A protein has these predicted regions:
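ATP-dependent carboxylate activation and anion-phosphoryl transfer catalytic cores
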Residues: 1-192
């Protein structure tokens, strides 16, 4: 997932319209709290399709909360909690969306185990801030569970999902990498 400004503007507007329409409909039918929607964009035609709806947080939720809470807003989870606390609150959604329209570039990569076999993990990298030097070598700078501490494009946060003694299997999420900047260029190929 690359989260960046200026990309796919027409498609982004279509996603916003679809999400707003569905959210309004769910609210009218009594649904309260946060939910996540995944959209698929055909980058050849510009068509936008609804991929799935999750009545919970999803793999993209951390990125969404990173953007909303870092750039002068409240985490979306805060609004979720307000709904379930029966708090009396109001928000101007257009102002919130306007504030969140400009932000830094962030990327998230979910690392999956691709092989069709089950194996015990003997050793796994630690969660924390990792840094790449000029030679392309990476090292753990500090253990952490907070990706807000990523300070530049030479650093990334790695969240370890499984550790030594756990089992890996085909499709298992092995870890999540969050970095500043984009991991793909406009041609959808990985950056250096």
């Amino acid at each position: 997932n690359d989260v960046f400004t200026g990309g796919m503007e027409k498609e982004r507007k279509a996603v916003l319209r679809m999400a707003q329409k569905l959210g309004d409909k769910l609210y009218a039918h009594g649904y309260r709290g946060a939910f996540c929607m995944d959209f698929l964009i055909d980058t050849d035609t510009g068509e936008v399709y609804l991929g799935e709806i999750n009545p919970r947080v999803s793999g993209a939720s951390p990125m969404t909360n990173l953007i909303t809470s870092t750039y002068g807003g409240c985490p979306i989870y805060f609004f979720h909690l307000l709904e379930f606390m029966d708090a009396d609150w109001e928000v101007d959604l257009s102002q919130v969306q306007k504030r969140w329209a400009e932000f830094d570039n962030w990327s998230q990569l979910i690392l999956k185990y691709p092989h069709d076999k089950t194996e015990m993990i003997t050793k796994a990298p630690a969660s924390g801030i990792w840094q790449m030097d000029d030679k392309g070598e990476i090292r753990l700078v500090r253990k952490s569970i907070d990706w807000f501490l990523v300070s530049g494009e030479s650093e990334a946060f790695y969240l370890r999902v499984y550790t030594g003694g756990d089992y890996r299997y085909k499709g298992a999420d092995m870890g999540i990498l969050v970095s500043r900047g984009r991991m793909q260029n406009d041609n959808r190929t990985l950056t250096e």
